[in-house]
Amino acid sequence: MSASPPVHRLVLAGAGHAHAQVLKAWPDRAPPGVELVVVSPHAMAPYSGMVPGWLAGTYGFQDIVIDFPALCARAGARWVPAAIDRLDPDRQCLELDSGETLHYDFLSLNTGSTLVPPVCDPSVTVLSMRPLSQLKTGYDQLLERWQAGAGTDAEPRPVRVLAVGGGAAGVESVLAVVNRLRTLRPDRPVQAELQTRGPTVLPGYPSGARRLALRALQQAGVAVRTGTRWTTGSAPACDLLLWAAGAQAHAWQRTPQRRGRLAVSPEGFVQIDGCLRSVSHPRVFAVGDCAHWHQPLPKAGVYAVRMGPVLLDNLLASLQGTALRAYAPQTRF
């Protein structure tokens, strides 16, 4: 006997933390008659909490990434290597940059956010913390040049590192990169500065976390400039710019013609209710950085991780027509 055709198609768009949890649990919890499809341009997705450890040299790159095609194979899901070009939530379909149109019964978005680094003088190496694929390429090249540098001057000029962004990514990346550079070449002096437009680092985090971060920065010799907006003309001279500021929604989310009538915040992030559903289209869910909770949350991976089990329960409930579960963000992490 041939297998019955699927009754519902569930599309997971984005290789994020929450979707990894859905895929891991799917073999044990999948309801009958559901086709699961995963769409992402990135086959290997980083666990964001381990990226600083990779930058510092504690982990290899393969240690910090999640192999999504392998997860899909174990879950019996179809893997589609493509990015969203357009969403029509009224027609319940995605148009992909591959040219494929993908219809869905339920859609979950876990596509993260993006960064737009500035255009700098060619003499400045710019490393944006997203996307990871570009960060890896740029960082590998930087370390290769750093180790190959002659460093034979009697009093070599310090290498100037500037990190922009006072969130967790900015703080952790400058500490990790400075430590890596000094460890690889203790003969070459490194000067570092972190710049943020906010009044302190780690806004929205507990005061204890801010104190620990400031202490670590001080011990590493990283100067901190607060209340400063980065501009090309006013930025201090640097050799390496670490860009971790201004998380943005993806272009299709910011463009009305490419997102249809999907409700988004003024910045383009998908507005969700207490059950992680779109406030305008209940067949669309959104989690992690791409989503806008009614009380804005920091763009930190720990939230997407904690959203994962709730997302799984609510996707299954939607497919089966049962009650949804409310999400309560953690207050400590």
Tell me what each language-model feature is.
Residues 124-155, 235-309, 313:
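FAD-site-proximal beta/loop scaffold in flavoenzymes
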Residues 2-77, 162-163, 171-205:
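Beta1-alpha1 glycine-rich phosphate/pyrophosphate-binding loop at the start
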Residues 120-220, 224-226, 231-232:
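Predominantly flavin-linked oxidoreductase catalytic cores and closely associated redox partners
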Residues 182, 303-329:
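Internal hydrophobic alpha-helix adjacent to the cofactor/substrate pocket in enzyme cavities
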Residues 34, 76-77, 221-223, 284:
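Short, conserved active-site loop motifs that form the nucleotide-linked donor/cofactor pocket
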Residues 18, 112-115, 247-249:
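Short glycine-rich anion-binding loops that position phosphate/pyrophosphate groups of nucleotides
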Residues 2-7, 74-160, 242:
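FAD-binding core/adjacent interface of flavoenzyme oxidoreductases
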Residues 79-86, 102, 179-274, 323-325:
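A Rossmann-like FAD-binding core segment of flavoenzymes
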